[in-house]
Amino acid sequence: MVIFLAYFLVVNESEAFFGHLFKLATKIIPSLFQRKKERSVMNRDLENLFDPYQRNLEMDRLLKQLRNY
């Protein structure tokens, strides 16, 4: 591994290689934090979806219309 890194430090292609690694890191690192945020929102939505005590406002509106007829 050390020989591999030393080779890339000497050769001109090292700039492109490390530039590519840096570009990948800047895309991957923010996506890791974004996934956690999306997961927490999804979990909260699922908890609200399966909460038996939550009122369904759309259903209430339809039932009120039904009573009027």
Swiss-Prot record:
Tissue specificity note: Expressed by the venom gland.
Propeptide: 38-69
Range of residues in the leader sequence: 1-16
Keywords noted in UniProt: Amidation, Antibiotic, Antimicrobial, Cleavage on pair of basic residues, Cytolysis, Fungicide, Hemolysis, Membrane, Secreted, Signal, Target cell membrane, Target membrane
Biological process annotations from GO: defense response to bacterium; defense response to fungus; killing of cells of another organism
GO cellular component, one term: membrane
Subcellular location: Secreted; Target cell membrane
Domain of life: Eukaryota
Recorded family membership: Belongs to the non-disulfide-bridged peptide (NDBP) superfamily. Medium-length antimicrobial peptide (group 3) family.
Free-text function comment from the UniProt entry: Amphipathic peptide that exhibits extensive cytolytic activities against both prokaryotic and eukaryotic cells. Acts by fastly disrupting the bacterial membrane. Is more potent against Gram-positive bacteria than against Gram-negative bacteria, and fungi (LC=25.1-8.3 uM). Shows potent activity against penicillin (MIC=3.0 uM) and methicillin (MIC=1.5-3.0 uM) resistant bacteria. Is lethal to the fungus Beauveria sp (LC=1.9 uM), a highly lethal pathogenic fungus to insects and resistant to many AMPs.
Domain notes: Amphipathic and cationic peptide with an alpha-helical structure.
Protein name: Antimicrobial peptide Meucin-18
